[in-house]
Amino acid sequence: MRILGIEGTAWAASAALYNTHDETIVIESDPYQPDSGGLHPREAAEHMSTALPEVISTILERAVSSGNTDAIGIDAIAFSRGPGLGPCLRVVGTAARTLTQALSVPLIGVNHMIAHLEIGRHQSGFTTPVCLNASGANAHLLGYHRRQYQVLGETMDTGVGNAIDKFTRHLGWNHPGGPKVEAAATDGSYHDLPYVVKGMDFSFSGIMSAAKDAVDNEVPVVDVCTGLQETIFAMLTEVAERALSLTGSNELVLGGGVGQNDRLREMLSTMCTARGASFYAPESRFLRDNAGMIAVLGAAMYEAGQTISVNDSAVDPTFRPDAVTVTWRDDETSVTRTPATLDKTPVRGAEAIVRRINDHVVKRRVEKSYRHPKLDRRLRAERTRAEARLTSAARRLGVPTPLIFDADPETGTLVFEYVGETDLAADLTVSRCHAVGQHLGRIHNAGFVHGDPTTRNVRVDSAQNYLIDFGLGYHTDHVEDHAMDLHVFIQSVTGTASDPAPLITAFESGYAETGISTVQSRLRDIESRGRYH
């Protein structure tokens, strides 16, 4: 079978021919290069209109020359349906519809972000991976569950590549900015910048503002580039590890154009090696936007019968990956976590190694060799202090938490009471989720947040539901911060539960009984602000 793929979501006009028989993938691309500054949507669309017919023509000629007859011999057309820039997508959609009618072959509408994931799955052979997509307009973590790729975590403002480009435009550098930052960082020293992780979600806007201010205040550009790269990529690596810990997966796939950065791949590889996980990053031609990944996913969708009619083939600039029904992997195992049983054997979480000693638990935040040493020391100490203080503060409010016996921020070590029999994930019931909502409402009314209230960070037994691991928590009266706590919990339930809807309803009901009235309306705002809602 031979599939023609067409890509053109933003800057890359690309066509590809994928032969499933011998796994050959021929790609022809013509990227848009602005004369100055960043990517201009109108100019990108004009480039797409000119370049896309040319790359398609080249691939069609290749299809004829590589076939056994003079016929083109293409079985289906797959195209990027979204997400992306509307004007560019419309050019792609028109080209795909024209070809499918001219050749009388089926049409397949592909989600661009799932294609970034699936090319890595296809080439690695992984069975239940978490995928980190790091591209220009996007950054998110995906895992297959309940016939969808669930979003386990994502940027709450801008994509990682776009964030870096905003900084480089401030310097007067033209698009793309990522390779220029990578080159400059080789000569710089680490400069401290804000580090914003909330559960498995993250934010780049504050980092960009701080980086611009640093340059304006005459901090050497190379130092700011080093700090920017170390901070952003450490955040992405941390949330990837958190996703592995939450789901229990031991496989990580990297996708997206930012994945071409050597330092990001080094960090992810180091993290996976440390926790005994496998890591796969496709070669560069499959990381940047390309039609090869569209053709490969298109072939899988075609074999599963997931084609569309021309009348139903409208492009979607806001096409989220979790809106796609994944029929081509319908019989596969979900990315779901085996709940931890904390006995005397050490248990490794995302941040720490935890060991039970009789009725005590010793938790040590381990050094993360992927992070810059200065950043690592800062985070380990800050989070150990926060966990000790906020765990005790929550307990004083009547929220079930373990007693803290000792805390050493310098070594990142805590000693606390052993509580619960297993994680909430092992007994994820309506009543327990209702109780978690009540607990979060109480701490929010007291002026602080948990920071990472996933099903991994609630311990349960027959009598209680204990909140643990307040390391990402902090004091705040901002409704946005409180709503993010709710968002993190709901996201963890959605990504792992077999029937999340009644659990989420119970959780929100519990919060309404004890929490702040404006928080749930802000939660709806946050959900609508996620990338491409």
Swiss-Prot record:
The keyword Lipid metabolism does not apply. ATP binds at V347, R348, G349, A350, E351, A352, I353, V354, K363. Its main location: cytoplasm. GO terms for molecular function: ATP binding; iron ion binding; metalloendopeptidase activity; N(6)-L-threonylcarbamoyladenine synthase activity; protein serine kinase activity; protein serine/threonine kinase activity; protein serine/threonine/tyrosine kinase activity; zinc ion binding. Residues 339-533 form the Protein kinase domain. Keywords: Acyltransferase, ATP-binding, Cytoplasm, Iron, Kinase, Metal-binding, Multifunctional enzyme, Nucleotide-binding, Serine/threonine-protein kinase, Transferase, tRNA processing. Its cofactor is Fe(2+). Fe cation binds at H112, H116, D289. The keyword Ligase does not apply. Binds 1 Fe(2+) ion per subunit. The active site is at D452. It catalyses: L-seryl-[protein] + ATP = O-phospho-L-seryl-[protein] + ADP + H(+); L-threonyl-[protein] + ATP = O-phospho-L-threonyl-[protein] + ADP + H(+); L-threonylcarbamoyladenylate + adenosine(37) in tRNA = N(6)-L-threonylcarbamoyladenosine(37) in tRNA + AMP + H(+). Residues 1-328 are annotated as: Kae1. Its EC number is 2.3.1.234, 2.7.11.1. L-threonylcarbamoyladenylate binds at N133, A134, S135, G136, A137, D165, G178, E182, N261. It holds the Pfam family TsaD. GO terms for cellular component: cytoplasm; EKC/KEOPS complex. One of its GO terms (biological process) is tRNA threonylcarbamoyladenosine modification. It is found in: Cytoplasm. InterPro entries: ATPase_NBD, Bud32, Gcp-like_dom, KAE1/TsaD, Kae1_archaea_euk, Kinase-like_dom_sf, Prot_kinase_dom, tRNA_threonyl_synthase/kinase. HAMAP family: Kae1, Kae1_Bud32_arch. In the N-terminal section; belongs to the KAE1 / TsaD family. In the C-terminal section; belongs to the protein kinase superfamily. Tyr protein kinase family. BUD32 subfamily. Component of the KEOPS complex that consists of Kae1, Bud32, Cgi121 and Pcc1; the whole complex dimerizes. This is Probable bifunctional tRNA threonylcarbamoyladenosine biosynthesis protein. It comes from Haloquadratum walsbyi (strain DSM 16790 / HBSQ001).
